[in-house]
Design a protein with these regions (language model features):
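N-terminal catalytic or cofactor-binding beta/alpha core of small enzyme domains
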Residues: 2, 12, 22-24, 44, ...
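Terminal, regulation- and interaction-focused segments at domain boundaries
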Residues: 1-27, 31
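Short hydrophobic/aromatic-rich motifs at helix boundaries and adjacent loops
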Residues: 5-6, 34-36, 75-76
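Ser/Thr-rich, low-complexity intrinsically disordered terminal regions
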Residues: 20-63, 70
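Conserved active-site and cofactor/substrate-binding residues in soluble primary-metabolism enzymes
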Residues: 10, 14, 59, 94, ...
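Beta-strand/loop substructures that line and gate deep hydrophobic ligand-binding cavities in soluble
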Residues: 56-91
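A conserved amphipathic terminal alpha-helix motif
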Residues: 86-107
């Protein structure tokens, strides 16, 4: 598992668009599901992506959650999982870290 948390001072829609564009540039990436909420002056978006990891030889998922209250900053949390191999220990997590790096490069 790898995790990225950021606080961004820009528009919610701009951040969401950059996330979606960055992830979907991968040939094997798919948007598995999504959910969007609005309540009073808050917004939340959840995206679950999956892609094939050539390094790990398996599929890796990434959950991205964006949250904004009013005109405050956009909070982003991205967590990848599923890229390790082995039954009892987490080894070979390159795929998880590489998937997360697709966001690091655009945020």
């Amino acid at each position: 598992m790898a995790k990225l948390e950021k606080t961004l001072n820009e528009s919610f829609d701009s951040v969401l668009r950059r996330v979606e564009e960055a992830v979907m540039q991968s040939v094997s990436a798919t948007l598995e599901d999504s959910c969007d909420w609005r309540a009073e002056n808050s917004r939340c978006a959840v995206r679950v992506y999956e892609r094939y990891s050539y390094m790990g030889g398996n599929r890796v998922s990434m959950n991205v959650t964006l949250f904004q209250s009013g005109n405050g900053p956009v909070r982003l949390c991205a967590i990848t999982s599923g890229g390790s191999q082995a039954m009892f220990f987490k080894i070979n997590t390159w795929g998880e870290e590489s998937f997360l790096d697709t966001l690091n490069s655009v945020l």
